[in-house]
Every structure is written in structure tokens, then in C-alpha cells.
Swiss-Prot record:
Function: Catalyzes the transfer of a dimethylallyl group onto the adenine at position 37 in tRNAs that read codons beginning with uridine, leading to the formation of N6-(dimethylallyl)adenosine (i(6)A).
SUPFAM superfamilies: P-loop containing nucleoside triphosphate hydrolases
Oligomer status and interactors: Monomer.
Record's protein name: tRNA dimethylallyltransferase
EC number per UniProt: 2.5.1.75
Residues given in the record as ATP binding sites: G14, P15, T16, A17, S18, G19, K20, S21
UniProt site (Interaction with substrate tRNA): T105, R127
GO molecular function, one term: tRNA dimethylallyltransferase activity
Sorted UniProt keywords: ATP-binding, Magnesium, Nucleotide-binding, Transferase, tRNA processing
Top-level class of the enzyme under EC nomenclature: transferase
Amino acid sequence: MPADTRPAAIVLMGPTASGKSQLAIDIAKRWGGEVISVDSVLVYRGLDIGTAKPNAAMRASVPHHLIDICEPWETYSAADFAHDARAAIDMIVRRGALPILTGGTGLYFRALLAGLSDMPPAHPEIRAMIAAEAKRDSWAALHTRLAEVDAITAARIHATDPQRIQRALEVYLVSGQSMSDWQNQPPKQRLPLRVLKLVLAPTHRKVLHFRIAQRFKAMLDNGLLAEVNALRTHPSIHAMARPLDLPAMRAVGYRQCWEHLDGMYTAEMLYQRSVAATRQLAKRQLTWLRGELDALWFDPEHDQSRIEKVMEAFLNR
């Protein structure tokens, strides 16, 4: 069999709070790599503490990409990510470095590695019309309307997920085809890389739950509420009629802090709700990761030497 001459890349996945960011840096230092964030919240400026965003020292130690590239009142799609990540990969490969893609946003990984169907781009006028209808009738009503034209997509979207409801209706109104029909088309532009997929996840769920709880407590101690309050009072967000519909503000921890600052519940309830929501996020991520049949799983506390051996074998073959 001829040698695979495609450039190598590392895909490091895992649930939230599993230690991916530090491992990505360790790999980058050891094998001359650069880190590409695959996280739908790390793209936003000003969301630092609640996202466990790599700090300045971590980002200075090795190059990082696709962090702090959007304002929190802007939208950033999986297609945007795939485009930007490809550009970053090309630049890294040209420098002779190893691309290390790390994060927990499954849709972004799929968009990059498998490609997206060529759906219509965003249409500002249609999007504004849908938002106005939602303000008048509610997102639940629009979810019902979506089910009438695209039952498959509606079944996958919760009635409280305005971003995805809006996009699905937008696709239908712009093209006359449902999102599920578009998604059934063959994907385009698969990534021309030789990829090693690694999953970092504690073997025992209680370990992950402990890490989640400890991390959120540290976030609160480090000023998460002040960070959320600064976002709430920013003129571009404060002027919005429904700021909690912003993708950035729906991030786990941020919505709960916002609602706590609104007086909806106590500090103890804030902690409990945020930890529970983060556990649910981790559960969804683990469910998706189990479908990545070609990925190798590692425990963050016990498999460091095994990770090194797998990396050496992959890069030297």
C-alpha cells in the first residue's frame, strides 16, 4: 500500500471539563503544533471565565486560532467555522506545524471533517421577518409552523431553541426546500488530512461530575457574575429586546448567571442549576462521542503515557 502523504492533524475531543485545553497545549509543545479551537462559545470576546477560555499565558505558550473572533451579539455558524478552520489549517500546514483541533462542539467537528451540504447562506431580511414573527407569536408557535413544513428537523429541535428554529425556517423560505432535504444531499469538501481522533474523558462519570462542580465554583470565585453583568450592560446587548436569545448568552452558566442577576433565584440555586446544566451538556457530548467509532478513548488522569505512544505511532508511520 502506498504511503499516505496527506498532512497529519490531531482531533482532540471530549466532554466539557475533561482537560482538553491543557492536553492540546502539551501535544503542541511536544510535537510542534498549533491549536485550533472547535468551540462555539470560545469564538466570542468577553466570554472568558464561564467558558474556561485558555488564558493569556496558555495562548502565549503555543499559537491558538479561532478564539475571540466575534462579538457576543454576533452570530457564527458551523459553515463560518468550517471556512475559518480550513484557512487556519492551511496556514499551519504551510508553516510545517501540526494542526491540533480541540473542543466539544460536535456540529463544528462534523462540518469540518465530513463537510456540510451546500445550504443557502443567511438572508438578513428573511431572518428579521422570522424574528418579528417570533416576537409577535412566540418561538413555540414558530416551532409548530416548522413542523408543518419539515417534521424531521422540527423533531430534532427543541421549541426553546430560537437560533435553530430560525435557521430551519430561513432555509425553507429562501430555497423552498426543507433543511432535512438539504442535509440528505451528499456533503462537499471533505478535509484532505490524515486525522488521528482522540477522546479525553474520565472513565468514571462521578470524576467528571466532580470536575464540573469544582470548575464552576472556581468560575464564580474568579468573577463570573461580574463578567456576565458587564455583558448585560454592554450597549449592543442591553438595547436588544431578547438578549437571552443570542447564541452567546445561551451558553451554559451565562444564562443561569443572567437569570440570577435578574433575581429569578438565589446564589445556591444558581450554582445547582449551572452544575446540572453542565452535566447535561457533558452527557450530550458523550452520547455524540460514542458515535465516533474511529476515535481512541483516554482517561485524563491515567493514560498520559498511552497517549504519547499513540501519537508517536501515528506521526511516524
